[in-house]
């Protein structure tokens, strides 16, 4: 039923804090974005979609959320990311 899907699968246990959350993708898509342990911190970065989501380390700085998709490798500091090819940038497999 809709209630079962909401609370168990997509809510706090399934999609949120347990499965999609803390260890794998971060404390749900709301709290800490996509990341925390799995998607975020080391690989993809820091505050973006939620709090520790897509940006900083590999993909960049202020763009989508807070420090999101852009700057360093992929984008800008204005709004939507745009592709910037940066040679010698191992984060995006740049030329060497």
Swiss-Prot record:
Expressed in the gastroliths. Residues 75-96 are annotated as: Disordered. The lineage of its organism: Eukaryota, Metazoa, Ecdysozoa, Arthropoda, Crustacea. Keywords: Biomineralization, Chitin-binding, Repeat, Secreted. The keyword Secreted applies. One of its GO terms (cellular component) is extracellular region. This is Gastrolith matrix protein. The gastrolith is a unique 'organ' that absorbs the calcium in the outer shell, allowing the shell to soften and break when it is necessary to shed it. The crayfish then re-absorbs the calcium from the 'gastrolith' and the shell becomes hard again. It is found in: Secreted. Coiled coil: none annotated. Residues 11-74 are annotated as: 9 X 5 AA tandem repeat of G-S-X-X-F. GO terms for molecular function: chitin binding. Sequence repeats lie at residues 11-15, 16-20, 21-25, 30-34, 35-39, 50-54, 55-59, 65-69, 70-74. The keyword Secreted applies. GO terms for biological process: biomineral tissue development. The N-terminus is blocked. Associates with chitin and plays a role in calcification. It comes from the Eukaryota. Transmembrane segments: none annotated.
């Amino acid at each position: 039923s809709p209630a079962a899907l909401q609370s168990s699968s997509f809510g706090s246990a399934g999609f949120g804090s347990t499965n999609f959350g803390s260890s794998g993708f971060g404390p749900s898509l709301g709290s800490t974005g996509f990341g925390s342990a799995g998607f975020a911190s080391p690989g993809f970065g820091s505050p973006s979609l939620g709090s520790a989501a897509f940006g900083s380390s590999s993909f960049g700085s202020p763009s989508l959320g807070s420090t999101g998709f852009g700057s360093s490798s992929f984008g800008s500091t204005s709004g939507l990311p745009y592709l910037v090819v940066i040679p010698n940038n191992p984060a995006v497999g740049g030329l060497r």
